[in-house]
Amino acid sequence: MTESNNPLPISEKIGVLLVNLGTPDAPNAKALRRYLGQFLSDQRVIELPAVFWQIILRGIILPFRAPRSARAYQKIWTNEGSPLAAITKKQAQGLQKRMPNITVDYAMRYGTPSISSRLEKLIASGCRRILLAPLYPQYSAASTATVQDEAYRYLQKIRWQPNLRSLEPYYTHPAYIQTLKKNIEDQIKALDFKPDSLLLSYHGMPVKTRELGDPYYFQCQATSQALSSLLDIPVITSFQSRFGSQKWFTPATDMTLKELPSKNIRNLAVAMPGFSADCLETLEEIALQGKSTFLEAGGENFAALRCLNDSEESLAMLEILVNQGLSGWLKSGE
């Protein structure tokens, strides 16, 4: 083998790929149909026989849901595009500044930039060790596992695979809990009212997933318990974003918001600890729909708190988590 076609790199670089759920390319029905078609075709997300489900998805769900979802996205779309994509990009850029000796990039499980395209880019740049970092504090097969599935689908296609690791779920990691605590307390202090309670709303899942062994529900409860022990405010846990006819985790966030005013909780703050960046579920489902539901039920004051996003505290937390994930790869002092 000549020196010119020797595949060995001069130095082996380390890459980190931050991954979040995904977003459409534009807030219109065509883009939403494409995005939702990819998302809802993932059998980690919809655990039904593919042939049966695709008939329902393509014939019934997408024609109706895509235009409705497009209208929801239009309410939160910014000059930078999708908030989730813009924030995740900033998280990667911020982490890169904090960790200049590694290469940091970001990808989306559904939509763009894809996991495969960013893995290809990292490998092409010389990264032979890559940390896959799904930005989901709580593990679920429908979120964390499908990110790993997609990464390994790409690796199956290449001859010289890099060493790939995945960031562990961090649902009770001290850095995560302390960062959430500060984020919540700082925002509550800045409100012009005093909340009677804090609602912690997580993305919901079908009860069946828990029965099949998915730890997500219990990890959400563990996060709430860890936070509650540190906060000087009553904490309530609920689950949002129900979809389909299956039985989902309870209590449901929308029903909880309807019921709280009748329980003398009329001043409410809502945090969403399972979301690492603000997105449709936080900005539209909670901040807009949730607020309307709560006030119409007799609530007086409502605040949807920002996610950790790309704040300095969030970036410091990510640096801690990534450093632990890279244990044994980084040289002392890097």
From Swiss-Prot:
Keyword annotations from UniProtKB, A to Z: Cytoplasm, Heme biosynthesis, Iron, Lyase, Metal-binding, Porphyrin biosynthesis
Pfam families in the cross-refs: Ferrochelatase
Disulphide bridges, residue numbers: none
Keyword DNA repair listed: no
UniProt GO molecular function: ferrochelatase activity; metal ion binding
Subcellular location per the Swiss-Prot or TrEMBL entry: Cytoplasm
Sequence positions that bind Fe cation: H203, E281
Example of a GO biological process term: heme biosynthetic process
Chief place where the protein resides: cytoplasm
EC number: 4.98.1.1
Gene3D superfamilies per UniProt: 3.40.50.1400
Superkingdom, taxonomy of origin: Bacteria
PANTHER family assigned: FERROCHELATASE, FERROCHELATASE, MITOCHONDRIAL
Role according to the record: Catalyzes the ferrous insertion into protoporphyrin IX.
Name the UniProt record assigns to this protein: Ferrochelatase
Organism of origin: Zymomonas mobilis subsp. mobilis (strain ATCC 31821 / ZM4 / CP4)
